[in-house]
């Protein structure tokens, strides 16, 4: 990425990373449109692609950080944005496939408020797991397993990215 300005590098990195994650959102809606019903095939494909994209994203970030020194604030902001994107995508899968148990309160999401899906994904992703929402179907449990694995890996990956950035480009020492 030599010869590019920092803003150009960020735009290129964003295109490489964000666009595939956004395209992943098409899967749950495509299944209903193309097949006419929910067969869960695209759910399984989508969850597999989440792991593949996660690995590619980590590889791209490591490569990006190897070539230039970056301020830690950008790494932190990127980490938070990436966390929100992952949880949002997993929430879309949970909403579209209706993977959480029903509640007596009617809403546009087949019986659960939208915030419950996002709350469930965040709590599972951070491996807190309060236990107030428990998936009842095999597909819901599979989503919980994938979310917990990604969440546990995500924290370790963030530490590895920070350490890699610091070891490649240690902070300058004050000479006084």
Sequence positions of predicted segments:
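Membrane-helix interface/capping segments
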Residues: 56-77, 99
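Membrane-interface segments at loop-to-transmembrane junctions
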Residues: 3-8, 71-81
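Outer-pore turret/helix-boundary of cation channels
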Residues: 84-119
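Alpha-helical transmembrane segments of polytopic integral membrane proteins
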Residues: 54-62, 89-93, 97, 127, ...
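Transmembrane alpha-helical insertion/packing segments
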Residues: 1-55
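Transmembrane alpha-helical segments of multi-pass membrane proteins
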Residues: 46-49, 75-89
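Pore domain of cation channels
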Residues: 112-171
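Membrane-water interface at transmembrane helix exits
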Residues: 28-32, 62, 66, 93, ...
């Amino acid at each position: 990425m030599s010869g590019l300005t920092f803003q150009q590098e960020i735009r290129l990195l964003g295109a490489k990373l964000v666009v595939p994650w956004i395209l992943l959102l098409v899967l749950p809606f495509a299944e209903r449109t193309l097949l006419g019903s929910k067969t869960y095939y695209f759910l399984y494909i989508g969850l597999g692609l989440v792991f593949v994209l996660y690995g590619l994203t980590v590889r791209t970030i490591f490569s990006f950080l190897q070539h230039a020194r970056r301020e830690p604030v950008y790494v932190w902001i990127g980490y938070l944005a990436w966390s929100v994107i992952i949880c949002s995508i997993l929430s879309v899968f949970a909403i579209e496939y209706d993977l959480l148990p029903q509640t007596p309160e009617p809403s546009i999401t087949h019986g659960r408020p939208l915030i419950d899906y996002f709350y469930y994904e965040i709590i599972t992703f951070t491996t807190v797991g309060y236990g107030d929402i428990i998936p009842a179907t095999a597909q819901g449990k599979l989503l919980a397993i994938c979310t917990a694995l990604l969440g546990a890996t995500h924290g370790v990956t963030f530490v590895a990215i920070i350490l890699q950035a610091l070891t490649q480009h240690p902070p300058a020492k004050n000479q006084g």
